[in-house]
Amino acid sequence: HDALPISGLLDFLIFKVDNRVEDVNLYGDIYIKKIIAGLLKKFLIGCQNMMRECIELEGSGFPVPARYEDIKNMVRGYLGFGNKMGEGWLLTGEMLELIHSGVSNIVCTQPFGCLPNHIVGKGMIRAIRENNPSANIVAIDYDPGTSPVNQENRLKLMLSTVKRVLREDSPAGSVAGNEESSSLLIHDNVI
């Protein structure tokens, strides 16, 4: 069983540091912030590169995560880099990274009524689907007041779409009841 790509904490840390650089670029903040944030970003990207090299060399079966700058470039045309509420543009970038790496079925969970992630996450799903017709993305809220039945129904609806697509793409009868081959990935966003 191949491991599926899941973004790590390091991308989020680089994103937070990079936001300080973008603040200076977009809003004209204190220039020393840009220098310090730039140095920290360079250090974190160096750590990411070492991690990528180790994963490649070890042959562990884990996919090598995309570079932060590659994820950032995927977002161009979707969102501006000044959009940093919640996970900001990174959430959209993570979904695009999954799609580009072959994962077309994504469950985007939104815990605790996080309004920024609702806006950015759910708001970008339509644009992502328009540019990536094979994308099957569902956003599910996990709040104390959210009905588990609604959550389960959204997952069942998504799985029915997966089954339909697999039937259309496969020889007759070869997909019956085989949800495991659908490359479903549950993606958990926690802020």
Residue ranges and their predicted role:
Residues 21-33, 128-130:
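Short, structured secondary-structure boundary patches
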Residues 36-92:
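Active-site rim loops that border cofactor/substrate pockets in soluble metabolic enzymes
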